């Protein structure tokens, strides 16, 4: 496998992930409302119309499902470019990059950037500094992301092995 390619892929995918999250969030913080802690959502809904914000709603499942399909497609390209030679090497590359992005999302985007970036706060919750700095909430969400990430990575490694090995 080519580690230079893997590092370049990781950097490019982190940039793409950041853009995919940050652009809609800056334009309309409500877009990702299901990803905010519940106390922030409840404060927002005190002064705004209630919209579906639980994880198992059609809107949220559609957004997350599309993201998983895109991740699966990207995974196939990533492991092919990296030179994966069997199921396990494809899984290592794919899930390794998934974990890197997951941890970047938790430890940098959620804990540092979004916790301190006033422009992504929901209207009416700007005063809730402590709620936006809930590290445990984002860490638990990151753990769920690690588990969910196994699905496209295992499927992708299987498809890759079937197609290219």
Model segments located where?
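Residue-level signature of transmembrane alpha-helical entry/exit and packing/kink sites
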Residues: 5-10, 89-94, 145
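Hydrophobic alpha-helical membrane-embedded segments
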Residues: 7-31, 97-114
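Cytosolic-side membrane-entry/anchor segment at the start of a transmembrane helix
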Residues: 24-67
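Short membrane-interface loop/juxtamembrane segments of multi-pass integral membrane proteins
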Residues: 41-56, 123-141
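Core segments of transmembrane alpha-helices
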Residues: 60-79, 141-155
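Juxtamembrane "helix-exit" motif on the non-cytosolic side of transmembrane helices
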Residues: 78-84, 163
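Juxtamembrane non-transmembrane "cap" segments at the membrane-aqueous interface
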Residues: 107-127
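Juxtamembrane boundary at the C-terminal end of a transmembrane helix
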Residues: 155-165
């Amino acid at each position: 496998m080519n580690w230079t390619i893997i590092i370049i892929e990781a950097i490019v995918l982190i940039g793409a992930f950041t853009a995919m999250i940050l652009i809609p969030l800056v334009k309309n913080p409500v877009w990702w409302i299901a990803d905010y802690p519940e106390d922030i959502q409840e404060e927002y809904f005190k002064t705004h119309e209630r919209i579906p914000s639980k994880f198992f709603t059609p809107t949220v499942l559609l957004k997350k499902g599309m993201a998983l399909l895109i991740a699966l497609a990207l995974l196939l390209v990533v492991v092919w470019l990296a030179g994966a030679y069997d199921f396990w090497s494809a899984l290592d590359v794919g899930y390794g990059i998934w974990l890197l992005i997951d941890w970047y999302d938790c430890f940098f985007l959620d804990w540092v950037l979004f916790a301190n970036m006033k422009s992504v706060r929901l209207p009416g919750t700007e005063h809730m500094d402590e709620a936006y700095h809930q590290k445990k909430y984002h860490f638990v969400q990151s753990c769920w992301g690690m588990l969910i990430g196994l699905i496209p990575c295992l499927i992708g490694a299987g498809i890759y092995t079937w197609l290219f090995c």
